[in-house]
Every structure is written in C-alpha cells, then in structure tokens.
Amino acid sequence: MVVSAGPWSSEKAEMNILEINEKLRPQLAENKQQFVNLKERCFLTQLAGFLANRQKKYKYEECKDLIRFMLRNERQFKEEKLAEQLKQAEELRQYKVLVHSQERELTQLKEKLQEGRDASRSLNEHLQALLTLDEPDKSQGQDLQEQLAEGCRLAQHLVQKLSPENDEDEDEDVQVEEDEKVQKSSAPREVQKAEESKVPEDSLEECAITCSNSHGPCDSNQPHKNIKITFEEDEVNSTLVVDRESSHDECQDALNILSVPGPTSSATNVSMVVSAGPLSSEKAEMNILEINEKLHPQLAEKKQQFRNLKEKCFLTQLAGFLANRQNKYKYEECKDLIKSMLRNERQFKEEKLAEQLKQAEELRQYKVLVHTQERELTQLREKLREGRDASLSLNEHLQALLTPDEPDKSQGQDLQEQLAEGCRLAQHLVQKLSPENDNDDDEDVQVEVAEKVQKSSAPREMQKAEEKEVPEDSLEECAITYSNSHGPYDSNQPHRKTKITFEEDKVDSALIGSSSHVEWEDAVHIIPENESDDEEEEEKGPVSPRNLQESEEEEVPQESWDEGYSTLSIPPEMLASYKSYSSTFHSLEEQQVCMAVDIGRHRWDQVKKEDQEATGPRLSRELLDEKGPEVLQDSLDRCYSTPSGCLELTDSCQPYRSAFYILEQQRVGLAVDMDEIEKYQEVEEDQDPSCPRLSRELLDEKEPEVLQDSLDRCYSTPSGYLELPDLGQPYSSAVYSLEEQYLGLALDVDRIKKDQEEEEDQGPPCPRLSRELLEVVEPEVLQDSLDRCYSTPSSCLEQPDSCQPYGSSFYALEEKHVGFSLDVGEIEKKGKGKIRRGRRSKKKRRRGRKEGEEDQNPPCPRLNSVLMEVEEPEVLQDSLDRCYSTPSMYCELRDSFQHYRSVFYSFEEQHISFALDMDNRFFTLTVTSLYLVFQMGVIFPQ
C-alpha cells in the first residue's frame, strides 16, 4: 500500500540509498501482486460472462437473491475494514507529528537549561569574587555599587534565559525597568531622590499592557495559537477532532482536522484525545488547509484501491458460486481455475491481517514514545519553573542589596552576611538547574562554597587570630614522602610507600615495599636524626656525612649502637650501585647449626680502670664494650656482621650476594683455643714471630705516637683500599685449591716492621683463621690503622691491579679429609711491673724471655668472636670494626673489586677439624704430601 507523504522533510532527505531501496522493494512486490490480480480478474470476468451465458439457458432465478445478499454484506464488511484502516493510519500519522514536535521542544528546553546553568555559574563566581575581596576598603563606596550592578545585570540575564519564548516581550519590559533601577541605584542618592519625586504615578501602569504576571511564571509556557490547549495543574490536554462521514462516496472529507473554538463545542464526530505537550511555534503555524492538501492524494489513492478490492471480491464470490454450481455438471475444465481463485483469496486475507498487526505494533511503539517524552517534558518544565523562581528571588535580593534604605548598614558585617546569602541563593539556583546525574558534583561544589562563605562571613580579626595560633609543627604534616638531605645521590629515586612519624623530635622512617631488587634500591639510608636540628640543617644545606657523624657524636652520646646490627646498612652518600647485598648472609642449609645470640650491654664509660669482659663471638655476634679513658668511639660496628660499603665507593663493588658461610650437608666443629694475651707497657726483648698466611695472623704494631685511626675496618673480610690499580684482577681461580691430594702448606710470613723508632721486633702471632685481634696497650700509642683487611685477602695502598678478584673459594678442600691441628702458642709481651689479675697459662712459654710476670686473661677464641677491650690512655679510636666480619670496600675503589662472590669457606661433604698450633709459626698437616711456601713479599710486595 503506497502512501504519498508529501514533500520530504529534512530527516528524509538525509536517508541514504540503501534505506530507500529497502522501502521501495515492498512497493514493487505489491505492484507485481496487483498485476497478477488484475490478470486473474480479467480471466474471471471472461469466465463469469461465460457462466452467465450458460446460466441464462437454465434460468437459475433462485440464486439471484442470494447473490445480492452476499454482495451487500461483502460491501459493508469491506467498508468497515477500510474505515478502521483509515482510522489507524490517521492516528499513526498524528502520533508521528506529535513525536517530532516533542523532540524539538525537548531540544529547546535542554538548550535553555544549559544556558541557564552557564549564566548561574557565572553569577555565582561573580558573587564569590565580590564576597572574598582582598582589600576590604575597596569593597565599599562606588566600586561596590558598580559590582552589585553587574551582579544584578547577570541575574536579569539569567531570568531572561530561563523564560520561554512567548514571554520575551514581557521580559523586555521588565528588563527595561530593571536597567532603570540599576542606573538609578548607581547614581548618587540625592539625584535618585530628585528623580523619584518627578516620576508620575501613572508610569507604574505602563507595563500593565501585557498578559504577563511576574509572580506566576508557571503560566509562561502557553502557546497563543488556534489549537485548543487546556492547562490543568501543568498538564496539557490536546484534543484533536477528526471529521469523518459514514458514507463511502464522501471519504475525501475523512481526514479534516478541525479546530475547536471553545470548550463547549459539540463532539459528535469521531475524536481521538492525545495527551501531549504544546506544539512548537512552527507546527502551530501550519493551517488546516495545508494538511488537507497533503492528505487529498492519499485519500484518492485509498478510494481507488477500495474499488479494486471490491470488484475483486465480487468476482471472487461470483466465481465461487458459479464453481459450486458447476460441480453439479462436472465442468472439469474449470477445476484448476477455481482452486487457484480460492487459494488467492486465503492468501489475500492473511496478508491483510499481517498488515493490520504491523500497524498496531507501530502505533503502540509511538504511544510509548509519546508518554515517555511527555514525562520528560513535564520534568524539564518543572525544573525551569523552579529555576525562574530562584532567579527572581536572587534578583530581588540583589536589588534590595543595591538600594539599601540605610547606607550605614550596608557596610561591615551586615554587607558580608547579605552577600553570603546571595551566594547561597546562587548556589541553590545552580543546583536546581543541574540535571540529576550532576547532583554529586554539585554537592561537592556546594560544600566548598559553603566553607568559603563561612570563612568570609567571619570577622577578619578572628581569621588573623586563628592564623597566629596555628603551630609551626603543622607545616610538617605534609611531609609524607621520604627525603634524605644527607644523601643527594638518592634524590632521583622513586618514593614508594613511606610513613614518617614525628614523635619526641625523633624521625622514624618506615619504607614499605616488596623484596625485589628494584624496589630494594629505594630503601635508602635509615639514619637516626635528632629532629630538633632539622631546621638548622635545612638552613645550612646538605651536610657532609663525616661532619654529620661528628656532630651526632658530640651532641648525642651513642644514641643507638649498631643500628645496622646484623642487617644491611649503607652509610650516607653511598652511590646507588651498592644496593644489591640482597642475598642470604648466613645461610646454613641442611645442617645442624646452633647459633646463640648474646648481645652484651653497650656502655660508654669515660674513666674506668678495671677490665670488663663481654664476649662477642663471631657467629653469636657479640660485641665487647670498650673501656678507655678519653677514647672517642666514632662508630662502633655500624655494619656489624653484615656487608657494608662506606663513603664514596664506586659502582663495581656491588654483588656481595653469595652466602658467606655456607655449610652444606656437614657438621662443622670449629674450635679455636687462643692463649692469653699479655700486655706490657715497655717491651725490652725482641720477638721474632712468624705470621703465617693461612693462619691469617696479623702482628700488632707497638710504636709510640701511633694514631689508631680505625681498628679492623674490614675485620676478617675481603677488602680493597685506596686507589688500587686495575691490574690485580685475574686471581679469580682458586688461590689455594688443594684437590684430590694431601697438601701441607707452610707459610712463613716475614715480619712486618715500620721505621718509626723501632726498638725491638714485635710479633705475637695472630692467626688468620682464628681472627684474633690483639689488644694494643701502650702509653701514647697512636695506631693509624690496625688490621684494615684482617684475616682476608687484602690489597694495600697502591697495589697493582692484578690482585683484585679473589672470587673463587680461597681454601677449597674437596673430597678429602684434612686435619688441621693448630695450637696457638702463647703471645707474650714484656712490660713493666703492673701485674694484671687473671688466670695463668698452664702451658710453658717456649719463649721465656720476660721482664715482667703478668697474669694473662682467659683465652678468647676467634670463632667465639670475643673482642678484647682496648684499655689505653689517650688512644683515639676513630672507628672500631665498621664492617665487622663482613666484606667491605673503602674510599674510591676501582671497578675490578666486584667478584667477591664465591663461598669464602666452603667445606663440602667432609668433616673438618681445625686446630691451630702456633708454636713454630706454621701449620702442620697430619697427612702431608706437599709443602708449598708462599712469601707475602712475593704475593703482596710492599
């Protein structure tokens, strides 16, 4: 069924070719079907003529009345069906028109709301700026009047934006009045009084020529057109009357849309009431004649289709009747034609039913859409009405503020409160005009504005008083990220989760991160600081680490000992390369290891004369107290039993990652029995002990005026010292690898002598493996550096670069049973007659030359890690065991000292018993097959 819809609208013009083809295909099929029907009708007409001629011969008069009755009923049925179809089509058309008009109105209302929101926000910002002026003196007088006039102008512009289109004329009159009021208020008060006295009373009625009501903005949405629209409680009821006559010949007048002149007009015709919003101005201007002209072609086409349908139905019924009659006479030649006619009739009825169902579904969808748009229009109109009310109240408030009766009350606190009220009204207006999905955002903005209003409404003196009462400590509340003023190298590192708590002028920095190597790099120096000095340090800038240590020692007497005790510690200003000491330091796998940790008390006593014993075993990590008059201990075991790197190390000394003491699948019993250490103040006799390489003995140096700067900085660990050349690298193989053989190593180390007033040879043996540190007891002894690389492969000042990477196992004793019997002989020192209390050695001293007899202290085994106390007058001990029992690197090492990674003492699948015998200054192996003698002068030339 082709419907001519008149000129295409703009929406149909945008329809592409594919959609047009899809719409034309049903029309083409319908035209084909009409052609087939016409062909059949022509054939049936010929058949009916033939049958009629046949019937005349037999004069079947009894069927004449039946045929007429059938034709009359069929015509009535077809007329009713056609009327119903026309009614549905007209209703559908009206719904389409209504939907398009509602869409346009919705678009206009949404644009109006958007403009109103923008205007209200600008007004709110203007009032906020007026409320929070920096200089209160400028907020008075003429400047304030001008700003208030600008606010009134913005409010009037907002009212105009929120007003509907048909109220623009009324709003123009109101705007003229408001502008006049603003100009009058901005003028001096004397001029205003003079003008008011000249205004006639009749001028108040000039604006009463329109139908507007400033106090009733709800009625502003009524279109002044000729279509009947009834407003009852903001609901629009549009009555569309369709005039239709029951006669079939007068169907041309079926679609006339008549306007109802008043509410008392008769409703005799068929009417359809559609609840919809007001039509837009463009639709309302379309008259009824144009609509009738568009519908006339459709009506003519429908009439022609009805005639064709009626003829086809009549001929079909006639053919059926004739066919029934022909069955009596057995006209076999018409049998196929009759079946075809009956089949076509059934198909025609099914198609009509499907078309009716399709129209009904489309009509239902349009009804749902119309009701939805109606609800949305109602909500938008309500929001616009509330916005207009709020804007009018705000405008009145600003007008009252602009023209106060008493000018004295417009200043000071009263003016602030009035401006705050204006801001509140503006914010309420913004909230009213905002859509529902912006309520959360508007609430946040409203809270901020309310806070600003409260702050601005308070007196300025109260604000200053509150600012004075703010403590200075509140400035540090934002310090939630970790910063280290003493470590400038770490300033570029990412700051992860950091918690800094200020309690009792102490800083506790807890770095929370994963255990990966990358994140471990961020866990930089944890240095105890006294927060009372933070302000001075920030003013002075970054302090060098040495000065920082001295200042901490002078002011804080050993606040915390061994902060890096058995943990990983990195001193300040260490380069970023010394961050990968992440391996297990003491991993004891598949063995039975008994570790007893007994940490002795740490004391500082300036004047004590008695000896105090505090055991500090190697594996139990004990540290003995130092007792000496006037002894300044800079840092005691900062990196006790842990790998550490000190000031300004290069990037090459990173990967001390291997397990230092890996004792796998074995039971190791290390027993070191060290004889008593005797101290004398004056040595008269020469001693010529040997310091074996494998026993790791370091002879004490007893010289007057020796400054002991640091004692055992790299105690019993591999270390490298100042400015070592790069030639000493490839000692990466096993230095002393004794594989599948019985070896006897005898190493005789020459005496180490120094040329500062040597009187006697010194040399109580100090075994390497026992790691025993001899006490220096001598008046006015300044020992510069004792055992900087004690009991480890070491390289001294400016050694060649070929002696660096002692990375392999130093003493790998594999697949053999080695028995080391080492007996540490007595270490005797002769001095003058002060005899110290102690136990006397049961063994005979093979070196019997003594001038004074002294009791000796109880044995102090190396593996029990007992550190003898240093008792010397006027001994300045700068640093004791800074890197105690750990690998360490010192100032400006080259890049070649990297590979101290191997297991230092790996004893695999064997039972080893060590016993040291230091009588003759060499090691005696129970089973010896080979003797290798190494001179220290050969390996490490001075």
Curated annotation (Swiss-Prot):
InterPro entries: NBPF, Olduvai_dom. Residues 831-849 have a biased composition (Basic residues). It is found in: Cytoplasm. Encoded by one of the numerous copies of NBPF genes clustered in the p36, p12 and q21 region of the chromosome 1. The gene is NBPF8. Expressed in the mammary gland. Residues 89-130, 339-401 form a coiled coil. Keywords: Coiled coil, Cytoplasm, Repeat. Residues 190-201 have a biased composition (Basic and acidic residues). Residues 165-259, 436-528, 529-617, 620-675, 676-767, 770-843, 844-904 form the Olduvai domain. This is NBPF family member NBPF8. It comes from the Eukaryota. It comes from Homo sapiens. The lineage of its organism: Eukaryota, Metazoa, Chordata, Craniata, Vertebrata. SMART domains: DUF1220. Residues 165-180, 530-539, 550-562 have a biased composition (Acidic residues). Residues 161-203, 451-474, 528-566, 831-863 are annotated as: Disordered.
